[in-house]
Amino acid sequence: GINIGAFSAPLLVGYFGEVVDWHLGFSLAGFGMILGQIVYVFGQKHLVGIGDSHHASEESKALMSKPLSKIEKDRMIVLMLSFLIMIVFWGAYEQAGGFMNLYAKQTVDRVVFGFEIPASFLQSLHAFYVILLGAPMAAFWLWWKRKGLESSAIFKMGLGTIIMGLGFMALVGAAYEVSVLALEKASLYWLLLSYLLHVIGELSSSPIALSFITKLAPAKYASFMMGAYFAITGLGNKLAGEIG
């Protein structure tokens, strides 16, 4: 559902914003946010009892007061190192909404069958590729595990970051066409390839990171570390804004 929304929103808002009027585009985005809030408010009846606080059992209290073992401390260090990888990953990945979109608007030939694709439409590519490749990627990693070739979570996250980096390398082809071949605009397929590699990198990193945290984080810090992961994601987005 999230990716369906992420796919359709840039098409609708992008069309009305770029083609019709920017004020209408922003209004449509605001309407979508209000609609989401309405669904949340009226859906509360389906969430009765979920997330309500309960008194901690004696066992839970004992667990929370127990000091971390050496193994748990080592795991926390590994998690911190993985957070560094994710800062770099999200800082690069979220360039899609910044300089990559400006690059698409100014430098890429977006005319297909006589129709110029609004640059904002390309923001749908990430979600489209996730919908298209999510199941095959999950099946691949399961097959990889059955073959006895299971890789560590750190390896997968590092690999995902490298693959995502290759997505930027694909833009070298676009730069070559413009700067060396002196074409007026770069071919669109370079950007399509770049986004494809970014999503393959994301599917190798993001789901793995969430699973990695739940497995490695000590029970007393599980919720904190999950929250820290999303804070790190936000820091990566901040880095993306500073760069692009």
Per-segment meaning from a language model:
Residues A170-L193:
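Helix-loop junctions at membrane interfaces in 12-TM secondary transporters
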Residues G1, H23, E116, L188, ...:
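Loop-to-transmembrane helix entry/capping segments in MFS-fold secondary transporters
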Residues G91, Q95, I200-P207, K238:
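Hydrophobic transmembrane alpha-helices of Major Facilitator Superfamily
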Residues M80-F83, S120, K185-L196:
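The feature captures the transmembrane alpha-helix scaffold of multi-pass secondary transporters
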Residues W143-M164, K185:
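Cytoplasmic membrane-interface "Motif A"-like loop-to-helix N-cap segments
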Residues G1-E18, L24-Y40, Q123-A135, T161, ...:
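Glycine-rich segments within core transmembrane alpha-helices of 12-TM secondary carriers
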